[in-house]
Swiss-Prot record:
Belongs to the glycosyl hydrolase 76 family. It is found in: Secreted, Cell wall; Cell membrane. It is an enzyme of class 3 (hydrolase). Its EC number is 3.2.1.101. Induction: Induced by caspofungin. Expression is also regulated by SPF1. Disruption phenotype: Leads to decreased caspofungin sensitivity. The keyword Ribosomal protein does not apply. This is Mannan endo-1,6-alpha-mannosidase DFG5. Glycans are attached at residues 86, 111, 135, 203, 243, 268, 402. The lineage of its organism: Eukaryota, Fungi, Dikarya, Ascomycota, Saccharomycotina.
Length: 451
């Protein structure tokens, strides 16, 4: 068995070359992988799993558990397309993802009950789905597919028909602030996973029905609307007070991404032009709002330099979803590819900061590092590069593994909104304060964006 020290040395030896900036040829896979290698080095700099006393699968604060899910999804793609012969990298990714699966293998580890929401579980589900669709090294006990099915089943079981006519709440646990808030990203993750599982397994009865249920609810509640110009607008969410009628008017790239790619998966699987139309509408809305001069930006906060740590990572999932959409709905490829190329070139030029000379920044439009750094900057840069070389995801029909369990997760208590864990009053109070801060940032965002 490889020791922690050996793993650390091996991974560091991957990146011994000295580089002061990243050059990238967007038409050359080797060039993209070469640049991405240094971005991945920056990701590992934040990793706690190689540090003495650190937690396997987690990244340094202020990054949350869900940020780790973002990172590992991109690392699976980097391994698959750029370094599939690197056994050290393979073990690091495998150990990190498997270690965070939780006691019931549904990505609800009890030690994350103070912060984990439905969206967090969903993001990890998306990461594990990357492993499924890339035939990444399988665990012996529970397959990646079984674990994604457990994520889907536990999320779907929390569908709350008693408030706002349906939908998922933001939070899983009743003691977390934000439990009274329903948001688009949580429901988007459920929609997205349903679409991917439908295509992968070939089973339409449960998964397509769930995707259609989520889409209809999003329209009915007013979280997803069509504007006069035909573009789709996806709002952040609303408190359940007054039937979710007071909608928070904030738009985030990753929310658009999960719905966009979900529609593309459904179109690819069903052949129904309704899903192609919806894909095209979200693509057009995304191109209109989240790009300036073809360069990707988190428009709701970035131009004002107001993005928080979470928001600075949203383009990670957005980029991944754009890449997947080009493969599943080829009709969108030319439009998306153009902006991905420009954004990847800008991201590479931003990766020219820090003491290593390749630390990535937030602003991809200025041809240099902007002084901003963090895990989100690294994962976003990685994903926009990987989106250029992504290949069609596997399914059971095209060579994917089929260790499936359609009932996975249904026998645990984690599918309930009220989870009976032994939590102290002090822990609940701390969780409430922590989540309240995040909710305040979301709901208060519209105020500072005016100025």
């Amino acid at each position: 068995m490889v020791s922690l020290q050996q793993l650390t040395i091996s991974i560091l030896l991957l990146f011994t070359a000295s580089v002061q900036s990243l050059d990238i040829n967007v038409d050359d896979k080797d060039s993209i992988c070469s640049a991405a290698k240094y971005v991945v080095q920056g990701i590992w700099n934040y990793y706690e799993g190689l540090k003495y006393g650190g937690t396997v699968g987690m990244f340094a604060p202020p990054n949350y558990w869900w940020n780790a899910g973002e990172a590992f999804g991109g690392l699976v793609d980097f391994y698959t397309y750029c370094q599939s012969d690197n056994s050290t990298l393979e073990k690091l990714i495998y150990n990190g993802m498997y270690h965070q699966a939780g006691e019931n293998y549904n990505y609800i580890p009890s030690n994350q009950s103070m912060t984990e929401g439905n969206d967090d579980q969903g993001v990890w589900g998306m990461a594990i789905m990357e492993a499924v669709e890339r035939n990444f090294t399988e665990p012996e006990s529970h397959s990646w597919l079984e674990m994604v099915q457990a994520v889907f089943n536990t999320m779907n079981a929390r569908w709350d028909a008693d408030n706002c006519g349906g939908g998922l709440r933001w939070q899983i646990f009743t003691w977390n602030s934000g439990y009274d808030y329903k948001n688009s990203i949580s429901n988007g993750c459920l929609f997205h996973l349903a679409a991917r599982l439908a295509r992968y397994t070939g089973n339409s009865s449960v998964y397509v029905d769930t995707a259609e249920k989520v889409w209809k609810w999003m329209e009915d509640v007013g979280f997803l609307t069509e504007e006069d110009n035909g573009d789709v607008r996806i709002y952040d969410g609303a408190k359940i007070t007054n039937n979710c009628s007071s909608v928070t008017d904030l738009r985030w790239s990753y929310t658009y991404g999960v719905f966009m790619a979900g529609c593309a998966y459904l179109y690819n699987f069903t052949g129904d032009d309704v899903w192609l139309t919806r894909t095209n509408e979200i693509v057009q809305a995304s191109l209109s709002y989240f790009f300036a001069n073809k360069i990707m930006q988190e428009t709701t906060c970035q131009p004002q330099n107001k993005c928080n740590n979470d928001q600075r990572s949203f383009r990670c999932l957005f980029s991944r979803c754009l890449g997947l959409t080009t493969q599943l709905a080829p009709e969108t490829k030319d439009r998306i590819r153009e902006v991905l190329e420009a954004s990847a070139e800008g991201a590479a030029k931003s990766c020219s900061g820090g003491s290593d000379g390749v630390t990535c920044g937030e602003n991809w439009a200025i041809d240099k590092w902007d002084g901003v750094y963090g895990l989100g900057e690294q994962t976003s840069a990685l994903e926009v590069m990987m989106a250029l070389i992504v290949e069609p995801p596997l399914s059971v029909k095209t060579g994917g593994t089929n260790r499936t369990d359609y009932s996975a997760g249904t026998n645990s208590e984690d599918n309930a909104n009220k989870n009976e864990l032994t939590i102290t009053g002090k822990d609940k109070a701390g969780a409430g304060v922590l989540t309240a801060i995040v909710l305040a940032v979301i709901l208060g965002g519209a105020i500072w964006m005016i100025f």
